[in-house]
Structures are given as C-alpha cells and as structure tokens.
Amino acid sequence: MGRGSVTSLAPGFRFHPTDEELVRYYLKRKVCNKPFKFDAISVTDIYKSEPWDLPDKSKLKSRDLEWYFFSMLDKKYSNGSKTNRATEKGYWKTTGKDREIRNGSRVVGMKKTLVYHKGRAPRGERTNWVMHEYRLSDEDLKKAGVPQEAYVLCRIFQKSGTGPKNGEQYGAPYLEEEWEEDGMTYVPAQDAFSEGLALNDDVYVDIDDIDEKPENLVVYDAVPILPNYCHGESSNNVESGNYSDSGNYIQPGNNVVDSGGYFEQPIETFEEDRKPIIREGSIQPCSLFPEEQIGCGVQDENVVNLESSNNNVFVADTCYSDIPIDHNYLPDEPFMDPNNNLPLNDGLYLETNDLSCAQQDDFNFEDYLSFFDDEGLTFDDSLLMGPEDFLPNQEALDQKPAPKELEKEVAGGKEAVEEKESGEGSSSKQDTDFKDFDSAPKYPFLKKTSHMLGAIPTPSSFASQFQTKDAMRLHAAQSSGSVHVTAGMMRISNMTLAADSGMGWSYDKNGNLNVVLSFGVVQQDDAMTASGSKTGITATRAMLVFMCLWVLLLSVSFKIVTMVSAR
C-alpha cells in the first residue's frame, strides 16, 4: 500500500466527501471538463475490472476500505438505454430504488446501489462488495446541452458481513509502526509550491513589520474611497482631520499602492496541482464550490462569480474586497474618520444617566414641600360646621333674661301647647298659630322657637313616587297609628345663671344649652272609626244570637225534664 507514496495522507486525514459534494463538485467538474484543486479520484472502467482489483487503481494510497472512481457507462445496445454491468467473472446487480440527492429543495443527482455477484445471472453468488453509483441530474446543464451521462462517480467498499451495515466505519485502523520513522510528507505539488515562494513576496506579514513602511510603495495623504465602502466600527468623530470631505478619503498613514485605480493583489491562481493560500483578514465569496460554474457556460442563480483580468487585478468596487483597509492602521497614526458615521454625542445613543427624570424649569420643589404643611391642618369645628347663628333674623341672646319675663314666656308656651292639643290638627291651623306667635311681640322665646321649627326641612317625597308592594305594606302599617310626633331642637348660648341655681349640669362643654321641644298632634282616622264601629255591631249581634241559642236550649231542656218527671 505504498507508505512512501506522494499520495499518502497523514493519520486522521481521510477523503470522505458527502453525496452532495460528490455530485455538485467532483462529478459536475468532471462532466464540464474542469480541473480539480486536488485530484483524488482516478478514471477507470469499473465494469471491466473485478472489485478486488480496484483498490490498486485508486490514486489515494491508504488502507481505508472505500475507494472512489470515475467511470464511463457501457451500453448493452448501441441504440438502447440498458447498461452493461457484467464483468469477466461476475456482474453488478441493482438493489432497491434510485434515491434523489438534493441541494436544498432542488434535485441535483441520483444514487443507485449495486451488489457484486459471482457467476452469471440469475444464479450468481452474492458477495460483500457494494457500489454506490452517482449520476448527475442538473436542469441547467440539460438546457445548456452538456451530456450529463458521460461519466458516473462510483464509491466502492466491502462490508464485513452479509446483511445491511448501516453506520459501519470503513476507515483503516491506526498502526504506529508505519509512522515511526516518517519524515515530512507533502501533498502533490506542495514541495514545488514551497520552493517557488520567495521570502520577500510579502504573502506572510510578521507583526513586527507593521511599524515599518515598505520603501517600494507610494503613500498618499488622501485617497478617494468608493461610495459602497463599509467603514465598520473603527472610526471616531471628524475631529481627527481637517479634510473637506473626510467621508471619501483615507487619513494619512494608510499605505495604498498606486496601480491605476486598482488594488494590487498577490497572485492566487489555483492550477490543477496548486494549493490555495489561506490569508487571514480577506473576505472570500460565500460559496460551497466557487469554481463549479466555470467552463460549462452555465450561470447558477444562487452563485455570483467574480470576474478577474489576466494580470490578477481586481476592481475595487466590489463587496468582496480582499484588502482589509480597516486593518492597516499604524499604532501612532490617527484612525480613519468619515463624516457619515454617527458621533457619540449626537443624542441618538441612550446613556444610563438619560433615564433619570429631568426637572422642569417652572417647578419649585420648595412649594411642593410647603403645600402639605402641618400648620394648615388645624381642626376648627367652627369652619366646618359654619356659624351657629344660622337662623334668619335671629337676635343675639346677650341679655340676661329676667326671671319674670322667663316665667311669662314659659306660661305663654304652655298655653300655646294646650291650645294646640285641643283638637286643631290641620296644617292651615298650625300655620295660623305660628303667625300668631310671630305677631305677638311679648313672647320672644316662642318667636325664636317657631323660627327654629320652621327652618327644619320637610322629608322628600321622591320615594313615595316609586312605591312597591312591600313599601306600601310598610307604609300602611306605619300610618295605622293615630298620633304623629314632630321634634325640634333649640340651642341657647351665652346665657349665664346664678351660681347657686344648681342648673350648671344642663350646659355642655362649650357652654351651650340645648332644649328639645316635641309637639304631638292627634289625628282622627275615619277608616279606623268605621272599622271599629263595624266590629262592635258584629260583636253585639253575635252576643244576641248566642244568648238566644242559650235561651232556646234551656227552654227545650226544661220542657223535656217536665215531661219526664210527669210520667
């Protein structure tokens, strides 16, 4: 197995592509006659060789138990569609159905599984050799007229036993003896590539060389920048330069090569036996296979190809810029500062201190604290209750009443009450009485009392307008009485009595004397009188009937006793 061959891979490196990679990259490039970056698949006629002879024909010399080959299909008939899969000692038999290989939602190829049988059909002996045959199925190539069935890609492996072996690993086990005295090993053409690379090609830049400016470069103070250039986040305010249009120029200190409006690029062409250069900081087009469309005349709708000239010069107005302009700032020089980047103090950036509430200009905090002053919470019942002299035309009781006048007033009040209880219960009569009290100047006490009783508001009759059955029943029960009492209160203030009178208990703590007057009016209810008279008549009649029944019963009993005693 040729350990010293140039195609040997180091331990751990294996050629194990996926189905999509086999179809979309390797088989498609082979059909389109395009070169490979690393040619690992050989071309052979699978159906002219036995499976155990194929490992020696592989380009990859390893002990792995799977091999890859390009093969041409052999038609059984020149004008037919059947394929001749017979070898000298056996044949490959199809097993199962063909499976689709998809790239997203698009079908890009088909996969067929075949098993090798010794002998001739239909009595062949089944073996453990299995082949996966991949064929291309691309609508774009079909429209372009590219023959897709010119080649098929075959993956051949040998199972460890009969039956399905899903998930079986076909990698060779590691043998330490094979690599004990192994020296430096290169992949194909890697040594030639390393010899052709000079030390002064500036492909690799040491970090110590950043402070040194190359002498062969022409440095400009200000170079125009393309409109679609992305400045990134490395810029500050426009205070670092005095340029008229700092957004379209690079600040001094950025080394740019004068190449006629283009950026000079290192040579990175990929020949058939060349290995790509991986350079940190460059931006490459995002594509799984960037070169798969070159050579077939087919443009994929999902892939954008970059066009380059023969002298390896790339136009700078592309979003795939290979020169990291924002990485070549020198330590002691100012950063690029375009004016289209937002400064930090433009008000659009929210700081933590901005979340606090700003104090208004016309707001005085001292007035707010003095609004709820405890001195203004002093309770004054006179302000809440209003003045005590709430009766109209009320005279002040500052004079000390004489005992004789007080006796006359009390006597006059008794006479008025007796006159009121004499049976005069109508409201018109009561109003006349109050008018009489007002017209009598010799009874000031009763005059004040009448004013007070007249100031008492009458109850509202709103509830009587919406009487329900329960309310009417309660009202009837309440109005069944014949006596209604009306009460009023009169307050006498600023009145002094003799110390030995013994009447100090009648004053409250404020020195006021409260007098409660009650007036009772007897009303005659005609309905109750009528019902009472009917009840008396009924009782009298029942009593008479009862007495007549007793008289009749006694007379009959007496008659019977007389007759019995006579016999």
UniProtKB/Swiss-Prot annotation:
The chain crosses the membrane at residues 544-564. SUPFAM superfamilies: NAC domain. One of its GO terms (molecular function) is DNA binding. One of its GO terms (biological process) is response to high light intensity. Gene3D superfamilies: NAC domain (2.170.150.80). Induction: By exposure to high light. Induced by heat and methyl methanesulfonate (MMS) treatment. Pfam families: NAM. Residues 397-423 have a biased composition (Basic and acidic residues). It comes from the Eukaryota. Transcriptional activator activated by proteolytic cleavage through regulated intramembrane proteolysis (RIP). Transcripition activator associated with the induction of genes related to flavonoid biosynthesis and required for the accumulation of anthocyanins in response to high light stress. Plays a role in the regulation of 20S and 26S proteasomes in response to high light stress. This is NAC domain-containing protein 78. It comes from Arabidopsis thaliana. The lineage of its organism: Eukaryota, Viridiplantae, Streptophyta, Embryophyta, Tracheophyta.
